[in-house]
Structures are given as C-alpha cells and as structure tokens.
Amino acid sequence: MESTANALVVKVSYGGVLRRFRVPVKANGQLDLEMAGLKEKIAALFNLSADAELSLTYSDEDGDVVALVDDNDLFDVTNQRLKFLKINVNAGVSTNSAAPESSGSSTPAGMPNPVSKIQKGINDVLMAVPNPMRDTISKVYMDLASKASTSSPVVGEMLDCISKLGQLSIPQESSPCSPVTKPGSSGASLSRDVPSAGGKKDISERTQTGRKPVNLNEPTGAHSKTSGHVPNSSGLGANFNECPFSGSTMNYSCPNPVNLNKHPRRVCHSKKSTNGDYWTSLGVFHKGIRCDGCGVLPITGPRFKSKVKEDYDLCTICYSVMGNEGDYTRMDKPVSVQHLHPFRGPFTQFPNPWLSHPVPRATNGGAPLRCTRPKLDSRFVLDVNVIDGTVVAPSAPFTKIWKMRNSGSLVWPQGTQIVWIGGDRFCNSLSVDLQIPKEGVPIYSELDVKVDFVAPELPGRYISYWRMATSDGAKFGQRVWVLIHVDASLKNSVVNEFHGLNLNASPSLDENFPSEFLGIMNYESAQPGSSSVNPGTVKGTDLEGEVGETQAVEKENLLVGEAHPAIPHGHSPSSSSSSFNMVDFPSMPAVEVLSGGSSSTTKDVPVPLQEDIEKNDVEITMLKELEEMGFKEIDLNKEILRDNEYNLEQSVDALCGVSEWDPILEELQEMGFCDDVTNKRLLKKNNGSIKGVVMDLLTGEKEA
C-alpha cells in the first residue's frame, strides 16, 4: 500500500496489551529508528523502566519467529517489505539489579525494582485470563504498579509476593528452581528461569509445618516463618481458600468466606461455621423441597424439617434467623427414595390408582397393613327409606335412613356423628350421634344412619345436606341429602283410625304387622299404645334387579294419605331393601305395592292412565333440581335420567362421572377451589385428572 512506502506500522504486544505506532522510512529504505530508540519507545508505551532488559521477537515473511537484537535486524525487516511489523515483547531482569539469590539463602542479596520483578508473574497470570478481560486488567495493573512502587517498602514486599502468583499452579519439586519456557519462544535467549516460590524454605520443614493461617492485618514481615505452598492434589491450581502469596490457608476476617460456586444469597447471612463439612454440604440439593421461609426451590445444603408444623422446611439461612434447635430436625442428605405428592403431601405407602381411598394389604401374619396416612372415609350405599322426591304432608315428622359404608382405612369410633352442612334446615338438631358399638365400625362394614326430620309447614321442595364427622367436628366422607316435596293438600287426607301407623321404619316380616297398611306414611307421631306399630331396626341391603319405567314414575310421586283396600293375600311385603311403596286411593281401580329391590314382585300391576303425563312432570321436576345443583346441560340431563330410570341419586353420580370424584372435590376445596360445579365440569373434561383440573383453574379456564 502507499502508506507503507513512507512509514511502517509497528504493532507491539506486551502483557496481553497491543499498542501501535508508525515509523518513517528513509529514502534509502531504512527505518528512521534505531534499536535503542525502539526499546525506549516500547518502554515508554508500557511504562517499563529504562534499564529493563527487553526481549523482542517478530514473525518474518515465512511465518517464523525471529529475534530483534540489533540494528541489522531492523534493516532486514525493511528489506522484507512487510505490510506491518508486529513485535512481541518479553521483559527480563534489570541489568542493574543485584546478583541472583542463591538457593540456600533465605533472603535475596539485594532488593530489585518491585515493578520489574512482578511483571513476569502478572504476565503469566494474564495468560489464563479470557481475552475480553485481559486488556482491562493489564491497564489497571500498570497504573497501580507504577504508583505503588515508591509508596513504601511494605508495598514493595507485597508486590514481590504478587509476582509469585503465576507459580501457584506449578507443582513444587525438591529442587529450589524450576526452569519454565514460555510457549512460542525459539531460542535459549527467550527462556526465563522462574524462581520457585518455595525456595526460601526447606522442603522437610514445609512438610512438617503444614498449612498455617495467615493474618493479613499484621505487617508482611511478621510472616517470615510462613510455610511454603503444598501442591494441590487435583492439579487444577490454587484453592480459593488458600492465600495466593504463600499457599497457606487464609483466615478471613469475614466469618464466611465467599464460595464462587454457590448462589450469592448463601454467602451473605449463612450460619457461621469453620468446619469444612459445612461447605461440602452446600453441594447437596433436596430435590422438590421448597423453603417455607424464603421460598427457594430446591433447598441447597442442610435441610431443617419442622417437628411442630406438618410439611414445613427451612433452609440454612432461614433457620439461622427464625429456627429453634428443638423444633427442627437437620437433614444433611436428601431422602434416598422420596415420592412427592403435588398437592397433599407424600403418597401413601400402597397407593391404588383405581380407587380414591388407600387399600390396606395383609402381612404374612394376616393383619391388615395400614397405609402411612390412614384416614376416615365413608361412602353412600343407598336410601333405605324416604327416597328423593317423596311427597309428605306439612309438619309431618319422619326419619330418614341412609346406608353408609366405611370406605376409609380407620375404624369409625364411638362418637362419630352426622352433621348438617347446608341446604334447608328442617331438623331440630345440627348434628346427630350415630349408634356405634364399642369396637366401632370396621372397614368395609355398613351402618344405617338415621336422622329425625319434621317437614316444613309451607308447601314446596326442600333439600337438606348432611355429612359424617368425628366427635371433634372434622368432616369426612361423601355428602348425602334428603329431598322431599311438601304438599298442603295431604294434610287432611289421613283417616283418624290409622293415625297410629308409622312407616318411618321399614316393614318387618312380622305377623302382627297388618299387610294392608304397607306404604302409608302418617304425618302424626306414632301413639305409644298403638299395636300396629313395629319399631324394629332397619337393616338395608343393596338394590338388586331391574326397575320398570312405571315403578320409576311412581317412585317420584310417593303420596302420603289413606288407603282402605287390602292387599291380596298372595302378595308378600317388601324386603328391607325396598326404597319406596305406593298405595292408591279407593277411587283408583286397583291397589299397587311396588318393591324397588325385592326379589318378589307383584303380579298384574295395572299401569295408570296418567303415566305419560306424570312421567313428563317428574322429568321436568328432576331437570329443575339438576339445574339447581349446577348441571346446566338439559339434553345430557334428560339422557342420564332416562338411562337411570329417573333415579335422582344414580343420575347425579352418572353426571359426576364416578363416585370416586368426591375425595378429589374435597381436595380441590382444601386447595381453595370452592366452586364444585366448575370442578366437576373440569374433572369430566380431564377424565378425573386432578392435575389437569388444577392447571385449567390456574390458567383461568372459564366455563363456555
């Protein structure tokens, strides 16, 4: 280029710093600069001492590294017609410095210039620094070194220690000096013998002394007996916990040394500890465990599990601030096998994916092996009497009986009760104690749950919700209800001579009980002296067999009134599993007694002429009830009602999907999702997956 004909661009690299300048070219083709002037120029550029011994090299036109020694070498450079001249500078020991120290002396013969002495050590350190940071560090170092060299002898001695920083990763041998050849050099003149940092002490003395703490608050001269550096077993250089000056362990004034591999929060206010095991434990992660103090996930280092609160853990930082030693258990290592339940703590030991309740398993001895988290639970089996939609007279007392099964993993103890949880209140008490034997109700056993009610005075539809609970009020199990229709026209329809009949108790196969009174419900209390009352205990069984459409229609229109005709002698009374009984008035052409679950059925039962009309009325009534419960899809409700023969209980179960959803709904309520209608809809959408429901609720899923 034209610019190189008049001047030559010279680039000088030293300590990772690159400087450039131009040197004019004379008419005879030689540089207007001699070798001495070039060294002075380089020393001025990098703030080097004037008497520093500089070793200059460059790459010739063939790519070989050539040394610049005298003016003849500069003349040869101009003859090569290079586009630019890049010079690599290596600074050596000053020519005016004292003789090198002997290997057996503990102190040098003379104190060299501190700045020139530390240059090589810093240069070696900078070689390991990434390129983006190398230029910045070099400039800062040059400024500090030039200003601090004349400040005090103490600073000079500190700089002497810093000059050995580059030797910390070199394995120490028994010889006091170890020659190191810098990469890229091509001659004996370019090699430099770097004195070993351990040359001031005997190896045997260093081995016996070991590492000793260094107090940096004392003058540097106080450490004349500091042991030498012990080589690192890993071979990866100096440890962060070592002093870079002598290789000894540092005694930080701060109680917690900074660990660069950890989160910075762990350094600020972690527990004071000088034990090396503490820092080792910080590498332990408790997967899936969140600190309930600061919210960090997962907990790193020791985990402190509360003995007082359930599912409460603290990390080391929060424990040092708010923890009490007696209330927490320290866990230095994570649990080897830990199944994490996303919502309600750990899984039971024997989970069953098909059931909502834990399944106890028998051990070799035959005793049931309880789950790790046993719980009380109950499941509705059937309505023993007063099925949904029963028509009663105003102010008529009656007893509702539900058959419930113990579906949990604990025995129902004495004191278990059923409590009112919502809906219409037409019972004199908010809770009723159950008749439970001393040994309790075993698992998978059934119990008749009885509650006395009094029908409201005003006509209309009434529903009351109940749920089982422990003696201390903790509710459990499925929700049950009683649904009645109060009809004012039935109040005066009962014949006085039958006022002693009480059909709250299911009829028993007793010869003293008149069969012609089956199915009649009296709105008055039973007279103590009445001989027609059989107060036996009701024992219900599961419904079996099919129920016809006529039976389903009449089931929803159970009338309370009088009945004069007698039942034919050939018919036997219904079993205790009967859900309803129907009695026609005298004006009707025949008397019907229908049994919902009995194996014995009536013969030649006539179908009422108004069957279609009544069936339509029942369907409309049940559709309204389902809509009030939250089931808004009318077509689906009709289909479910017809499939279940207008049995409201079975229809609700079918609309919910499966009865096992009740525990999931309870769990969603405990998590704060209290809209049962939305929860059921999302459970149906996600096929009973609680994870899918929670994700939809958290993402703001709205009902279409």
UniProtKB/Swiss-Prot annotation:
Reported effect, D60A: Loss of homodimerization
A single GO cellular-component term on record: vacuole
Record PTM N-acetylmethionine, positions in chain: M1
Region (Disordered): 95-114, 171-233
PB1 domain segment(s): 7-92
Family matches, as SUPFAM superfamilies: CAD & PB1 domains, RING/U-box, UBA-like
The UniProt record lists the keyword Zinc: yes
Biological-process GO terms, alphabetical: protein polymerization; protein targeting to vacuole involved in autophagy
Recorded phenotype for the gene knockout or disruption: No visible phenotype under normal growth conditions, but mutant plants show enhanced sensitivity to heat, oxidative, salt, and drought stresses.
Motif mapping: LIR: 661-664
Inducers of expression: By heat shock.
Entry keyword set: Acetylation, Autophagy, Cytoplasm, Metal-binding, Protein transport, Stress response, Transport, Vacuole, Zinc, Zinc-finger
Domain UBA as annotated: residue spans: 657-701
Entry's Gene Ontology molecular function annotations: ubiquitin binding; zinc ion binding
Alphabetized CDD domains for the sequence: NBR1_like, PB1_Joka2, UBA_NBR1
Effect in UniProt of substituting I664A: Loss of binding to ATG8 proteins
ZnF ZZ-type: positions: 286-336
Self-association state and partner proteins as the record states: Homodimer. Interacts with ATG8A, ATG8B, ATG8C, ATG8D, ATG8F and ATG8I. Binds to ubiquitin.
Known function: Autophagic substrate degraded in the vacuole by non-selective autophagy. Requires ATG8 protein expression to be recognized as an autophagic substrate. Acts probably as a receptor for autophagosomal degradation of ubiquitinated proteins. Targets ubiquitinated protein aggregates derived from denatured or damaged non-native proteins generated under stress conditions. Functions additively with the E3 ubiquitin-protein ligase CHIP for autophagosomal degradation of proteotoxic aggregates formed under stress conditions.
Official protein name in the record: Protein NBR1 homolog
